Design a protein with these regions (language model features):
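Active-site phosphate-binding/coordination module
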Residues: 20-120
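Short hydrophobic/aromatic-enriched beta-strand-loop microsegments
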Residues: 61-67, 82, 127, 172-175, ...
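Short, structured coil segments at secondary-structure junctions
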Residues: 57-60, 68, 166-169, 223-224, ...
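Mg2+-dependent phosphoryl-transfer enzymes with acidic/Ser/Thr/Gly-rich catalytic loops
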Residues: 1-4, 22, 181-263
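Conserved acidic, metal-coordinating active-site core of Asp-based
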Residues: 91, 95, 99-211, 215-220, ...
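Asp-based phosphoryl-transfer active-site loop
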Residues: 3-18, 221
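Hydrophobic packing residues within well-ordered alpha-helices of enzyme cores
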Residues: 50-54, 163, 237, 253
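Short active-site oxyanion
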Residues: 36-40, 60-62, 148-150, 206-208, ...
Length: 263
């Protein structure tokens, strides 16, 4: 029986080291479509930003869970969007500026960051091939700029605890490179995005299968009927999964879909 298949991007569909989505993964996506599955991208990125749109055009998802559930779209339709409170945002940015941390967000074709050189270093550590368009971070406080989530770059072990202690309403999901983290308000997750899409599609009774590799995927893998961890996933993600497949360079997506009888 077909249903909804949820895929993380970085480290799951996208091989960041080579900046490609493996042919076997694209083949699996096409076979899933033919079999009636709805394809959902579920990522910490905003897939509408200048450096992510090209991946969306390659995957051709039916729907996207952006920024860890902060925004949900179906095709060109905006289904849900949470906008951060400007007062909270101002407090976060002031704190990080005083501490010398790198914090910010990408909105559209612009990258608003404190200490942007640290963001560039984090991109390199994560092997992200991104051409950044940095502008002053204060632009995030413009009433016309809607900020859904933030991105942190820096020392996870030392700086992440300081941010979460000062702002208990925030949760930082570390990248697999440990060079940065997605920053979200507690209560938002990819799993919540899944619930919104299942409601939209009236998908009660349909199977949900989720694929991921990083800590921000754990809630999604647990919420799905079947959670699949990539072979290259963090150990905590593997423990949370129902099935662990091969890594991204050894046809992990295709092999899992075949093993589960999805294709």
């Amino acid at each position: 029986m077909a249903g909804l298949a949820f895929f993380d991007l970085d480290g799951t569909l996208l091989d960041n080291d080579r900046d490609i989505i493996p042919e076997s993964s694209l083949k699996a996506l096409e076979l899933l479509r033919r079999g009636g599955w709805r394809i959902v991208l579920s990522t910490g990125r905003d897939m509408d930003t200048h450096y992510s749109i090209r991946y969306r055009s390659i995957v051709r998802p039916d729907a996207v869970i952006h920024q860890n559930g902060g925004k949900v779209t179906v095709g060109d339709k905006l289904l849900y969007k949470h906008v951060m409170d400007k007062k909270l945002l101002s407090e976060i940015l002031s704190f990080c500026r005083e501490k010398g941390f790198c914090m910010g967000s990408s909105v559209g074709d612009k990258d608003y960051f404190i200490n942007p050189e640290k963001k560039t270093a984090a991109d390199r550590a994560y092997n992200r091939f991104i051409e950044r368009h940095f502008v002053p971070f204060e632009g995030l406080l413009d009433p016309d700029i809607e900020v859904v989530g933030l991105s942190f770059a820096g020392n996870i072990q030392e700086e992440k605890p300081q941010i979460e202690k000062h702002f208990p309403q925030l949760e930082l999901f570390a990248f697999s490179s440990n060079a940065g983290a997605d920053v979200v308000e507690r209560g938002f997750s990819k799993a919540e995005g899944m619930k919104r899409l299942c409601s939209y599609y009236d998908a009660e009774g349909e199977q949900t299968v989720a694929f991921g590799d990083s800590p921000n995927d754990i809630a999604l893998l647990k919420a799905a009927d079947i959670g699949v961890a990539m072979g290259n996933a963090d150990e905590a993600v593997k423990r949370a999964a129902d099935h662990v497949t091969d890594d991204i360079r050894h046809d992990g997506i295709f092999n899992a879909c075949r093993y589960l009888g999805m294709i």
